[in-house]
């Protein structure tokens, strides 16, 4: 009888030890968190205790928050499809110039054309090489007229080991998958390589779609802490269905820059249109250059899962509307 009791006690101790070991093995991980104002500028001054995170109604421990404005690596994927209008091409050129003009010391850029000719340029501080790349004939190293998502997948490999703030900016009319590259493949590659994707769309963007069934992509759940529209963001139930979930699930954002409303004329001869194009590109550059590096300790789950993040109500009551951009999949403990 005594032997059975001792055996039972030993099992209890063993199970408790394993549970403690599993809990102690939960190491905090760094996650890029963008908090922006209604006009797309970074929201500063937040601390760890101001954030509230949950996974399946279980709290996510926020261990620390640091404002990160260090050097960035930015890959630009530019659609050069001959079907694009002249105004769309002019807008694309203007956005690339704005992104480059917003660079800080230490920032490096790379560029890859999609759907047409042009030269691939790997990460460099030579802005002239980036701005001239799309006017080059190119030599078809990636095949004839590679698609946007095909190009993104190749570009992800260029980053190598992840560095803080790694980002991809896609300037394109759409993100249609190809026979060899699916949206799920791209979403997984972005997650695995800790890369945020931002979009400057040259067409209409659907904002009620999803890359995978387990990824929620309604406007209220894609990193927008409030229902007030951020500048340039509108809810559409038609248009490209991949731009929105791929960007927002990675912790980024997409702006519909051109051709979103068929009733409207998008002319780059209009100074107001030019200013709008520049402003959206500048907002993306700002989101890339500054963010909060959040250290979180997820609950003990065996696989990645969706999580929610918000700012406590007291902060929201006394601040202008803010929006939270964050990777929507949290790794397991």
Question: Model-predicted segments: where are they?
Answer:
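Eukaryote-biased intrinsically disordered, low-complexity acidic regions enriched in Ser/Thr/Pro
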Residues: 22-81, 93, 98
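C-terminal "exit" segments of structured domains
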Residues: 24-29, 236-237, 245, 260-333
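DG-centered beta-turn motif at the end of beta-strands
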Residues: 51, 77-80, 111, 164-178, ...
């Amino acid at each position: 009888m005594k032997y059975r009791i001792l055996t039972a006690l030993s099992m209890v101790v063993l199970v408790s030890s394993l549970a403690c070991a599993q809990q102690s093995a939960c190491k905090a991980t760094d996650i890029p968190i963008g908090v922006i104002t209604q006009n797309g500028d970074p929201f500063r001054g937040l601390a760890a205790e101001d954030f509230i995170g949950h996974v399946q109604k279980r709290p996510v421990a926020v261990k620390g928050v640091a404002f990160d404005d260090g050097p960035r690596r930015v890959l630009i994927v530019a659609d050069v499809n001959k079907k694009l209008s002249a105004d769309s091409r002019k807008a694309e050129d203007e956005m690339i110039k704005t992104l480059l003009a917003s660079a800080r010391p230490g920032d490096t850029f790379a560029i890859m054309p999609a759907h047409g000719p042009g030269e691939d340029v790997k990460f460099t501080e030579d802005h002239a090489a980036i701005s001239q790349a799309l006017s080059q004939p190119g030599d078809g190293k990636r095949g004839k007229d590679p698609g946007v998502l095909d190009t993104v997948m190749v570009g992800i490999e260029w980053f190598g080991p992840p560095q803080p703030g790694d980002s991809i900016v896609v300037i394109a009319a759409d993100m249609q998958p190809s026979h060899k590259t699916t949206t799920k493949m791209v979403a997984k590659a972005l997650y695995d390589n800790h890369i945020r994707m931002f979009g400057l769309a040259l067409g209409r963007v659907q904002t009620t779609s999803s890359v995978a069934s387990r990824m929620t992509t309604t406007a209220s759940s894609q990193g927008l802490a409030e229902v007030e529209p951020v500048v340039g963001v509108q809810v559409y139930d038609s248009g490209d269905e991949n731009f929105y979930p791929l960007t927002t699930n990675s912790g980024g954002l997409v702006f519909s820059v051109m051709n979103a409303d068929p009733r409207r004329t998008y002319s780059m001869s209009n100074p107001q249109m030019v200013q709008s194009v520049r402003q959206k590109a500048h907002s993306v550059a700002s989101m890339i250059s500054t963010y909060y590096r959040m250290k979180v300790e997820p609950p003990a789950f065996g696989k990645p899962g969706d999580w929610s993040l918000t700012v406590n109500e007291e902060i929201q009551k006394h601040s202008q509307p803010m929006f939270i951009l964050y990777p929507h999949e949290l790794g397991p403990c």
